[in-house]
Amino acid sequence: MGKIIGIDLGTTNSCVAVMDGDKPRVIENAEGARTTPSIIAYTDKETLVGQPAKRQAITNPKNTLFAIKRLIGRRFTDSEVQRDIEIMPFEITKADNGDAWVSVKGEKMAPPQISAEVLKKMKKTAEDFLGEPVTEAVITVPAYFSDAQRQATKDAGRIAGLEVKRIINEPTAAALAYGLDSKKENQIVAVYDLGGGTFDLSIIEIDNLDGEQTFEVRATNGDTHLGGEDFDNRLINYLVEEFQKEQGVDLRNDSMAMQRVKEAAEKAKIELSSAQSTEVNLPYITADATGPKHLVLTVTRAKLEALVEDLVNRSLEPVKVALADAGLSVSEINDVILVGGQTRMPLVQKKVADFFGKEPRKDVNPDEAVAIGAAVQGGVLAGDVTDVLLLDVTPLSLGIETMGGVMTTLIEKNTTIPTKKSQVFSTAEDNQSAVTIHVLQGERKRASDNKSLGQFNLEGINPAPRGMPQIEVTFDIDANGIINVSAKDKNTGKEQQIKIQASSGLSDAEIEQMVRDAEANAEADRKFEELVQTRNQADAIAHSTRKQIAEAGSNLADADKAKIEEAVAALEKAAKGEDKADIEAKIEALVKASEPLIQAGQAQAQQGQQQAQQSQKDDGVVDAEFEEVKDNK
């Protein structure tokens, strides 16, 4: 059985790890980095992922996609998506099923399809390290991800050629990574996870009993649209507004300029975690009739903190809710673990320390902990790790719409999963022959204020007065947090069930098509790589042959020389084309035409040998004479 890898599919960066013996190990990518930017770029010739995509973003802003995780499993009409439409340089569009998709070069693409490109890079990184194919993975998601977002993440894995063995929550994964190194008996930890696009807070109880560790999530809360991207956007807006005040030019209309500002803002934000001030210097950012304009502005740490303080405060609200749900006070938290790159900001660290009354742990790598935890869970599922038990929870309450437009909850939030719960309902009218089961996720009393996950009908109910039929509704949540709902008429035994895929999401047929497209692209990529290798081989042979012709000199007959040069020219011409077989044929033709050159080379080598032997004899005489001269002195 192959290894089950752990992947942290992040908004800004992604990371892959695997169990190496009994220890989890983060794997470096082809560029030598331990994390990979979650950036995908589509050019005329190829799809770029990670650092290569990031490098060309300034010149290709409309086809360079980032923070796609903020769109995954979301409806186009969601307020968060509408906010992103205003600030993203690429085009967010409405899919036929109402989902938020992206338009690239006139083609509509689903977020899982785009995220699959990052997962494919993670898969390849692991395969290069392990030296064997990888087909299974544990992928992490924010704890507060909805069912639709979890389904979409699984779909992305499937498109990338991975069987997703488990979806686990990011804070839980981070706690797994922390718990491996912690030998304390029993403790309660708070994982504060502020990443590139999402925020989670989980309260986790870690029990050590006879060498076995149990990780039980007591409560979780969060905001799936709060993260480093929002911090960046505050600084971007400030830079753009200051430039407009000074120069009278609005850079928001220039996507290339905005991409430069975005990069500079991200860099400045990172620098201000260690410095008190930094200079943003973007020469020739734009030009008007008066000439070129430069953006030069000093940003202090205090200014950045003033711009984002409300965002940090916003992150503390879910912390309060999670503590209340867990029935714990701040003083009962033994350790606070910071996860996600944005937690490197001193203001975030200070606010968290002030809230909990203790300094957060600094010995957990915020960029790698989640992937490490995912790898540990992969080890558990593969049977390689036997002393760890993970008990996660469902982040939001689940129920159905009942009479009067009310949500009746069947499974409360923070219930340990997997779980199953049934409840009996009845009809609202006399002789009602069918009921619609409308499945909801959320905490509000009014059904319409919660997220609709889908609906289905149970038909064929025998005519009876209202309130008489017995309809049993069952919710079943698996270990991935994915939901199945069934309704059964207890009188007739008729049953109807659905695996929730929300009213949106990708159909099986669409996923299969995307898998086929991905496989076709992989085949095209392989063929392109082989073509490049053949071209390089052709170039090396042509260069080597020309060099040999020059060295052969008069040892090569003019007629032979002309034939070989003709074969070299034919090969160089073929190498500029796209036909690998033609290049290979021309290489073969050149090798055949070069036979006289090989003979000339051998003749020249023999000649050289004879000259060397003669020279050695001569050298002996000279040495003797030299010695005699030396003696005379």
UniProtKB/Swiss-Prot annotation:
Q: Which residues carry this modification: Phosphothreonine?
A: T198
UniProt-recorded name of the protein = Chaperone protein DnaK
What residue spans carry the Low complexity bias annotation?
600-614
What the record says about family reads: Belongs to the heat shock protein 70 family.
Alphabetically, the GO molecular function entries are: ATP binding; ATP-dependent protein folding chaperone; unfolded protein binding
Which organism is this protein's natural source?
Answer: Glaesserella parasuis serovar 5 (strain SH0165)
Query: CDD domains given for it?
Result: ASKHA_NBD_HSP70_DnaK-like
Q: Which UniProt keywords apply?
A: ATP-binding, Chaperone, Nucleotide-binding, Phosphoprotein, Stress response
Tell me which HAMAP family the record gives.
DnaK
